[in-house]
Amino acid sequence: MTTALSEQQTGLSGRVARVIGPVVDVEFPRGELPALFNALTVDVDLEAVAKTITLEVAQHLGDNIVRAVSMAPTDGLIRGAEVKDTGKPISVPVGDTVKGHVFNALGDCLDEPGLGRDGEQWSIHRKPPAFDQLEGKTEILETGIKVIDLLTPYVKGGKIGLFGGAGVGKTVLIQEMITRIAREFSGTSVFAGVGERTREGTDLFLEMEEMGVLQDTALVFGQMDEPPGVRMRVALSGLTMAEYFRDVQHQDVLLFIDNIFRFSQAGSEVSTLLGRMPSAVGYQPTLADEMGELQERITSTKGRSITSLQAVYVPADDYTDPAPATVFAHLDATTELDRSIASKGIYPAVNPLTSTSRILEPGIVGEEHYQVAQRVINILQKNKELQDIIAILGMDELSEEDKITVQRARRIERFLGQNFFVAEKFTGLPGSYVPLKDTIDAFRRICDGEYDAYPERCFNGLGGLDDVEAEYKKLQEK
């Protein structure tokens, strides 16, 4: 396969000196070394099939040798093969041409080969916006998902982390957010699939096509079957496309990264292959630097923004692991998906007591929103504290006040669940968008005890209070 990079050469060429898996040492003529991060290309014949492999310069070793990381499997690559310098870093297509299409980390279109090669391309290695260009205003991003809008509100132009172990709903929540942003705001989204399953990528593409939101989304994939160099760079490729929409087309953009842990994991693999001494728990010593270079580019500039939603796999549900811990430092809001809540059949399985947002304060969200959120959290916290007593002595031993608190907490817990648009075909129930003011009013009324007479099952996975009342009427008719 010929890549866009293979067609742009500087005339500088060298020879492969050593191949160790995805790491390739290349010898160049004296005084003619390519710059760090430059893309190199080498032609390979494997079983009578010609292909071009792209390498990225990672180190200058001395003696006119550079060490590069391959962006494709190195099968068929031999010592002595000619390597050409493109004279610039890996670049990807930008602009409206990328919408509705799938790309790899090198900017090659996978669903329509050749697309975007003739248009504008940007290097994936870019500097973050200057300090005087940053937006100082803080604004809430309304999602229509009750538990998020009320208890862990997202910042427009902020960075949001979705934490959780395997199988608790991170990818489903990301798909739902893409759908909602396209439907409610007609916004542009960029999805970067970092080291996840190829099946999930295919499912996402087909679902988005089916739901009519694909034309507003660019997809960039570097999946788990690809070399670590690709998985380390694909997030930067997606971010570069998003930066163009923000800086040139002046749009508000949503950047989805699934999964940011795989970015750290790929960096660890590359670091080991390059011979660096590992740091804590075997991670690369440059983990904080690499994460910072990516995260500092995700920000709001004057009048426009990139809001990033990042799924974070937590290895063995251990939040002290260096990879998720490093991500924490950059986030404006964290949404923790909890296996114990998912086991109750409540989706999204957001843990309201451990999820956080830096903007949940009266000066930003308003006094009423803040007070209702605090009342909800206090009721849920009190319920959690009473669980040990209930487990040992039963509900009958609680005071009347505590009994009311526990019953309200159960209703709140179930009402925090919600039907998703992307889950309609699985649940058979239509998705729901609940405006923020309706969410605040609904939880205020539940906390006030207006719905204490309603059975708990009336609150399961519904939208607003209208749905609850309709469900209650159905039960009465039966």
Curated annotation (Swiss-Prot):
Pfam families listed in its UniProt record: ATP-synt_ab (PF00006), ATP-synt_ab_N (PF02874), ATP-synt_VA_C (PF22919)
Keyword Nucleotide-binding appears in the UniProt entry: yes
Keywords, sorted A to Z: ATP synthesis, ATP-binding, Cell membrane, CF(1), Hydrogen ion transport, Ion transport, Membrane, Nucleotide-binding, Translocase, Transport
Gene Ontology MF term list: ATP binding; ATP hydrolysis activity; proton-transporting ATP synthase activity, rotational mechanism
Chief site of localization: membrane
Superkingdom of origin: Bacteria
UniProt subcellular location: Cell membrane
Binding site for ATP: 164-171
Catalytic activity: ATP + H2O + 4 H(+)(in) = ADP + phosphate + 5 H(+)(out)
Listed GO CC annotations: plasma membrane; proton-transporting ATP synthase complex
UniProt topology in membrane: Peripheral membrane protein
Top-rank EC class of the record's enzyme: translocase
Keyword check for Protease: no
Listed EC numbers: 7.1.2.2
NCBIfam families in the cross-refs: atpD
Protein family (similarity comment): Belongs to the ATPase alpha/beta chains family.
Assembly notes: F-type ATPases have 2 components, CF(1) - the catalytic core - and CF(0) - the membrane proton channel. CF(1) has five subunits: alpha(3), beta(3), gamma(1), delta(1), epsilon(1). CF(0) has three main subunits: a(1), b(2) and c(9-12). The alpha and beta chains form an alternating ring which encloses part of the gamma chain. CF(1) is attached to CF(0) by a central stalk formed by the gamma and epsilon chains, while a peripheral stalk is formed by the delta and b chains.
Function (record text): Produces ATP from ADP in the presence of a proton gradient across the membrane. The catalytic sites are hosted primarily by the beta subunits.
The protein, known as: ATP synthase subunit beta
Species this protein is from: Corynebacterium kroppenstedtii (strain DSM 44385 / JCM 11950 / CIP 105744 / CCUG 35717)
